[in-house]
UniProtKB/Swiss-Prot annotation:
The chain crosses the membrane at residues 1-21, 27-47, 48-68, 87-107, 138-158. It comes from Uria aalge (Common mure). Its main location: mitochondrion. Its EC number is 7.1.1.2. Pfam families: Oxidored_q3. PANTHER family: NADH UBIQUINONE OXIDOREDUCTASE SUBUNIT ND6, NADH-UBIQUINONE OXIDOREDUCTASE CHAIN 6. One of its GO terms (cellular component) is mitochondrial membrane. Gene3D superfamilies: NADH-ubiquinone/plastoquinone oxidoreductase chain 6, subunit NuoJ. This is NADH-ubiquinone oxidoreductase chain 6. It catalyses: a ubiquinone + NADH + 5 H(+)(in) = a ubiquinol + NAD(+) + 4 H(+)(out). The gene is MT-ND6. Belongs to the complex I subunit 6 family.
Length: 172
């Protein structure tokens, strides 16, 4: 089980690197799907099945919208692939920054600990609902900030896709 969780963590990091160094929206969405599946699988392996399912459904809906808009904006007949030297350079640069951050910060700052509510014997399902309660009690500010950011992103994408048309107002 430890190796499986380590594999999911590695897939999550590689998916994030694929999104950060995406040469084309066609390949960037593959990185998004890989990162979201690995992250939700990671949560599922920790026993947080409800939150994992909700996040997976939200990620799939959001990724579908972002993929459709980004493909409509950048319809290249010959998209760059991940094997191009420019893209490989971006990926190596991101890995170098990640390794430098670990070397400078050290591994001690990652010891956040784990707090469980009631995960003994038959009550292991309580852990999942305790996490949902923590989302809405302590994480309400982050939810509001994330919702505001997503709303702003939606309007920015809609404005970019609209182009020069004025909607119902016509030029005289």
């Amino acid at each position: 089980m430890t190796y499986f969780v380590l594999f999911l963590g590695l897939c999550f990091v590689l998916g994030g690197l694929a999104v950060a160094s995406n040469p084309s929206p066609y390949y960037g969405v593959v990185g998004l799907v890989l990162a979201s599946v690995a992250g939700c699988g990671w949560l599922l392996s920790l026993g947080i099945s409800f939150v994992s399912l909700v996040l997976f459904m939200v990620y799939l809906g959001g990724m579908l919208v972002v993929f459709v808009y980004s493909v409509s904006l950048a319809a290249d007949p010959f998209p760059e692939a991940w094997g191009d030297w420019r893209v490989v350079g971006y990926g190596m640069g991101f890995v170098a920054v990640l390794v430098a951050g670990v070397v400078v910060g050290g591994f001690e700052c990652w010891d956040l600990g784990m707090v469980t509510v009631d995960s003994v014997g038959m009550f292991s399902v309580r852990l999942d609902f305790g996490g949902v309660a923590m989302f809405y009690s302590c994480g309400v500010g982050m939810f509001l900030a994330a919702g505001w950011g997503l709303l702003l992103t939606l309007f920015v994408v809609l404005e970019l896709v609209r182009g020069l048309t004025r909607g119902a107002i016509r030029a005289v």
